Design a protein with these regions (language model features):
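A short, charged, and often flexible helix/loop element on the N-terminal side
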Residues: 31-56, 65-77
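Conserved alpha-helical elements of sugar-nucleotide-dependent glycosyltransferases
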Residues: 15-23, 76, 178, 182
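A conserved amphipathic alpha-helix that caps or lines the catalytic cleft of carbohydrate-
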Residues: 24, 81, 183-187
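N-terminal subdomain of nucleotide-sugar transferases
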Residues: 1-39
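A short, histidine- and acid-enriched strand-loop-helix "catalytic/donor-clamping" loop
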Residues: 68-73, 89-105, 119-120
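Donor nucleotide-sugar binding/catalytic pocket of nucleotide-sugar-dependent glycosyltransferases
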Residues: 116-153, 173
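Membrane-proximal helix-turn-helix segments that form the acceptor-binding/catalytic region
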Residues: 82, 86-87, 104-120
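Conserved donor-binding/catalytic core segment of Leloir-type glycosyltransferases
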Residues: 4, 156-187, 195-198
Length: 198
């Protein structure tokens, strides 16, 4: 089976690997044929490259996987999903944006066009799955983000000192205050718990 995976491939520009680069590679290892787009940095070039890929590979692929976020990158998912519908290609949004529940509330018609017509919507968290189900979507499956657990050794601790690391932006949509509240609660049981926010 061949798949087209649409997302941001930015590691060649010096950024960390994204889901399309890690999951795409894992799917290849499982025997799937994978076409990917896009490594373009500029918004307009990236959306054009994604659209071109949908048209180019329309007869070769069974499904299109679309990394779907809640803010500006939502438009990639919207445009490419609608193009896939016109071309009669099944597509699967992979939900990443923690602010997607607000997108569901603020843009219900656009979201209906994308998510109700998807073959499946993949939620990596129970939070997003529940939010989509609460919004009336029945085609949502929970598939947690993958992690190669064998790369991480278990460190047995006699005394636990939690060290939290926040690696998201400080924008309000990511709710950075929640990390501080979690630290406050942890310090009730583990007074030496720390939080680093980068």
């Amino acid at each position: 089976m061949k798949l087209l995976y649409l997302g941001s491939q930015w590691s060649k520009h010096g950024y960390n690997k994204t889901t399309i680069e890690t999951l795409g590679h894992q799917l290849e290892q499982e025997g799937f044929g994978i076409y990917c787009a896009s490594d373009k940095k500029l918004f307009s070039l990236r959306i054009l490259d994604m659209m071109r890929s949908v048209i180019r590979y329309r007869k070769q692929v069974t499904y299109i996987l679309i990394d779907t976020y809640s803010t500006k990158a939502f438009w990639y998912a919207f445009v490419c999903s609608q193009l896939a519908r016109v071309l009669n290609i099944k597509y699967i949004p992979i939900l990443h944006g923690g602010n997607l529940p607000n997108r569901l509330k603020n843009n219900p018609k656009l979201c209906q066009m994308v998510f109700a017509n998807a073959h499946k919507n993949v939620a990596p968290s129970g939070y997003l799955k529940q939010a989509f189900e609460n919004a009336g979507f029945t085609n949502v499956v929970h598939i947690p983000n993958s992690i190669e657990i064998d790369k991480y050794k278990l460190k047995t601790r006699v005394e636990l000192t939690p060290k939290l690391l926040w690696v998201r932006a400080f924008a309000s949509i990511y709710n950075p205050e929640m990390a501080v509240k979690v630290l406050f609660e942890l310090q009730k049981k583990y007074p030496n718990a720390t939080l680093t926010m980068v």
